[in-house]
Amino acid sequence: MLFKQCCEPADLCKAINEQKGRRGIVKVRELVEYADGRSESPLESEARLVFIDGGLLMPELQYEIVDRCGKLWRVDFAWPDAMLVAEYESMEWHATPEALRHDRMKVARLQECGWTSIPMVVDDVRRYPLDLVARIAAHLNHATSLAG
């Protein structure tokens, strides 16, 4: 709702406060602080919750990177200090030949600029969240050790 600009954060909070006594509303109140209109899909929001639960540094959302040819690329999640990105790849959005070409070009161009890209699919987020956190944490730790 926030991404589609159907409501503002204040509207969301007001609606939540009007739900006093409803089952599950306490959990909703705890999670609303993590709502971010920059998430472009429900799975991106779920992935952010996995990152939070896993104790990862919060990434920049919808981060823009300009490659060596001047082309602008936007990534789902970025940790700029570590030159690390993570991209959620849904089967619906990324399954066509055109989308596959675009994704491969994007990863190649980002790698040419020194970025590491971690792909994520629904199973990473929903079935193996600890493995996903470990993969990202390993890359973040490696980048920190190189910088230090």
Task: Name each region found by the language model.
Residues 2-148:
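Surface segments flanking catalytic/ligand-binding clefts of nucleic-acid enzymes
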